[in-house]
Swiss-Prot record:
Entry's Gene Ontology molecular function annotations: 3-isopropylmalate dehydratase activity
Name of the protein in question: 3-isopropylmalate dehydratase small subunit
Catalytic activity field: (2R,3S)-3-isopropylmalate = (2S)-2-isopropylmalate
Subunit and interaction comment: Heterodimer of LeuC and LeuD.
GO cellular component: 3-isopropylmalate dehydratase complex
Pathway: Amino-acid biosynthesis; L-leucine biosynthesis; L-leucine from 3-methyl-2-oxobutanoate: step 2/4
CDD domains attached to this UniProt entry: IPMI_Swivel
Species: Kocuria rhizophila (strain ATCC 9341 / DSM 348 / NBRC 103217 / DC2201)
Coiled coil spans: none
């Protein structure tokens, strides 16, 4: 997972509340277990509408999604985060996230930045006044800047640290590789051990 400190990218206003994981990626696309190849499935039910925000040319290449409240509710599918990342999003901004979605996001390198609802509406206004405007998201200072306006966002310290260090669950485990090898080296040979890492 790559380290995250700041990100600057085109913002897309998703003016919908209660966007659940089935709307983010319908269940029919969940047959694969790889983390890639889901970009076409993102918001599949809505992308048939030519007026849907991600179909509009001014939001092409958007990497910051600003959504309504209660984003990521529903089933706890990691595929929702995979689809957002595979499409190119690095940040989702909302006034409230489902707990499991927020947890999955941090583990997959997607920043779920929680702001006040009034700030969501301000960002929507700025993006609609200047379609294609870039938002700068600074994880270190926990701020989002757009068109000369800055708003603070909330994120727990642990998830912030993991994102800034670029540590997914495997990366966290590998930080203790020497301890794991020492423990396994001291275990009796008849007990199971992990296989050596492949290069």
């Amino acid at each position: 997972m790559e380290k995250f400190s700041t990100h600057c990218g085109v913002g897309a206003p998703l003016k919908q509340s209660n966007v659940d994981t089935d709307q983010i990626i319908p269940a029919v696309y969940l047959k694969r277990i790889t983390k890639t190849g889901f970009d076409d499935a993102l918001f599949a039910g809505w992308r048939r509408d030519p007026e849907f925000v991600l179909n509009r040319p001014e939001y092409e290449g958007a990497s910051v999604l600003v959504a309504g409240s209660d984003f990521g509710t529903g089933s706890s599918r990691e595929h929702a985060v995979w689809a957002l990342r595979d499409y190119g999003f690095r940040v989702v901004i909302s006034s409230r996230f489902a707990d499991i979605f927020r947890g999955n996001s941090g583990k997959q390198g997607l920043l779920a930045a929680q702001v006040e609802q009034s700030d969501v509406e301000l960002l929507w206004k700025l993006m609609e006044e200047q379609p294609g405007v870039e938002l700068e998201v600074d994880l270190e200072s926990r701020t989002v800047a757009c068109g000369g306006v800055g708003v603070p966002f909330q994120i727990d310290d642990y998830t912030r640290w993991r994102l800034m260090e670029g540590l997914d669950d495997i990366g966290l485990t590998l930080q203790h590789e020497e301890d794991i090898e020492a423990y396994e080296g001291a275990r009796p040979s008849f007990k199971p051990t992990t296989l050596p890492a492949r290069s």
